[in-house]
Each structure stands twice: as structure tokens, then as C-alpha cells.
Amino acid sequence: MESDPNPSAWNQYINPRDCTQGLCSTFCPQWCTYINFSPPPISYEQFLNDGVASNPNLSPLVIAIFGIFATAFLLAAYYTLVSKYCANDTTNEAASESGRSDIILDVNSPERGDQDDPFALESSTAGLDDTLIKKIGFFKLKKHQNGFKINGTDCSICLGEFNEDESLRLLPKCNHTFHVVCIDRWLKSHSNCPLCRAKIIVPTTQQPEHHVVVMNLDRFTSNVGSAEGNVVVDDHREEVSVSISSHHPSWFSAADIVLRISRDGEEEEGNYDLENGNREKLVDLKRSFSSGGLVLGTQGRTRRSLNICP
């Protein structure tokens, strides 16, 4: 068979769109053979298994470590939030307490007025020593029919009524009366009267052996007045007859008398005439008048409380 010397001459008779001839062309790709270099698709489960097996860093130990760190981070964030919230509450509470204290300190500022003024105000944070508090006079309340009565019927600190045989303490200058327990607790952190804010000045000099303090009672006026009764010693319940007369035409307060007596450890008992400072027995009692009430004083060294009974 003789070959055609010019095969290109046949090409002009070949129709590239005719796929029946079995020729590979653009119009007949089914007769073309291609080499596919891409791997076949795999399932999702096979992909996960192959990924874990091919990556040794994602072991259970690594996952556990990441879990521990995540838990620690969450706990630290929770602790930070709780601490911040509690700190804000504490700050707000301290600010409110400071606001109330500022009001008290502003009212009780020592710069307001003269310090020697009996109604001078000072800071409530300055308290008195126990020794100074104990130097303030006190007495036991006695209520009898037609007897003496003190001004006021209750304690301004605890708002409790004064009952018989209760120990009451009389503040100097303002002469306000309070329960001993209540006012002692107040004076440990304050140096003024809780009712009128008058500054409390306790005498530091040694007191006389015999000292009679007259507490404020119901006020009355009379040109000639008298009061008689028995002074009862609180410690040993001893009675001393006392007669008080006044010919001074002025206002004054009848009162329970706290008589503090001690001379070489012995109590003195007898009849006393306090008119014009005359003595009927043992001691000379002097009388003086002040705006706070009648004050009777004698010479002495230590104190013991006594009360007047009608």
C-alpha cells in the first residue's frame, strides 16, 4: 500500500465537528484521554480520623491542659468581678458613714466659738479618760411620795425612763442627767453633752474630802423655803438627818443631794443645819447659788454617794 505523500490534503475533508470519526477534538472530548492528578474525595469521618492520626500534638493530654487553663482563666475573671463589686459596696458604705461623720464634725467643730464657752462645741472623736469620767458626780434615784423629782423622766441616750435605785450621772455646766452606763459609754468617744453639746470640763484639782452636789429638780420660787429629810449612804445604807432652809428670795432648784463623806474610812452621822453655813455637828457646810441649781460644799478628800429621802 502506497502511502499518501501529502496527508495534509486529507485534512481539508475532515469535519472536526463530526464525532463519528472517533477523533479527539474540542468538539468531541469523549474521544480524548486526560490524566487526573487530584485525589478522590473522602468522607467526613475519614477526614476527621486522618486529621487526628496525622497530627500528634492534639493528644488528650494537650486537650486537658487547655481545659485547665481555660478553667483557671474563668475563675480569675470571676474573682476579679466579685472583688470589684465588693470593693464598690465597701467604698459606698464608707462614703455614707463619712458623710454622716462630716455633718457631726461640722456642727461640733471647735472653731465655732470660744473654747471656754460652756456651750462651745468640739469634735465628737475626742473622748474622756475613765479617770475623768469617774470624777463626774452620780447619784441613785429615789422616788417617794411628795419627794423630790429630777428634771426629765428619761435618758436622752437610750430613751429609757429613770427608775428607782438606778445610778444617774449629772454632767457639769449643763446639769443634764443620764444613766451612768449610757453616759460613760458616750463620754469614751465624746467630750460634750449628747443633749446640748456643751463641752464637759472636769476639774483636775483634788476635790475636798466632803463634797455635796445638788442635782437639778423641779424648780420653784419662794421667799422662805425649807426641805428636810434623811440622807442615805449608798454603801452602807446609813441615814443622816439634814435640814435645809433658805431665806433668799430667788429661783432655785430643790434636789437630791449626793454627799460624799470619808475621813479616815469612817462615815459621819448627825444633824446638819445648812442655813447661813452654820454647823450643828462635825462639819461646816457652805451654801452657794448658781444658774444650774443649789450647790452645797464642804471640806473633804474623797467621795461617797448619798441620797435625800423625805
From Swiss-Prot:
Q: What is its main location?
A: membrane
The transmembrane segments are 62-82
GO CC terms of this entry: membrane
Homology family: Belongs to the RING-type zinc finger family. ATL subfamily.
Q: How does it sit in the membrane?
A: Single-pass membrane protein
The annotated pathway is: Protein modification; protein ubiquitination
List the PROSITE patterns: ZF_RING_2
GO molecular function of the protein, one example?
transferase activity
Which positions make up the signal peptide?
none
Entry note about domains: The RING-type zinc finger domain mediates binding to an E2 ubiquitin-conjugating enzyme.
* CDD domains (UniProt xref): RING-H2_EL5-like (cd16461)
Q: Which Gene3D superfamilies match?
A: Zinc/RING finger domain, C3HC4 (zinc finger)
User: Which InterPro entries does this UniProt record tie to the protein?
Assistant: ATL1/ATL16-like, Znf_RING, Znf_RING/FYVE/PHD
EC annotation from Swiss-Prot or TrEMBL: 2.3.2.27
| Swiss-Prot/TrEMBL catalytic activity | S-ubiquitinyl-[E2 ubiquitin-conjugating enzyme]-L-cysteine + [acceptor protein]-L-lysine = [E2 ubiquitin-conjugating enzyme]-L-cysteine + N(6)-ubiquitinyl-[acceptor protein]-L-lysine
What is the name of the protein in this document?
Putative RING-H2 finger protein ATL53
Q: Which Pfam families does this one have?
A: zf-RING_2
Record organism: Arabidopsis thaliana (Mouse-ear cress)
Keywords, comma-separated and alphabetical: Membrane, Metal-binding, Transferase, Transmembrane, Transmembrane helix, Ubl conjugation pathway, Zinc, Zinc-finger
Q: Report the locations given in the UniProt record.
A: Membrane
Alphabetically, which GO biological process terms does the record hold?
protein ubiquitination
Which residue spans match zinc fingers labelled RING-type? 155-197
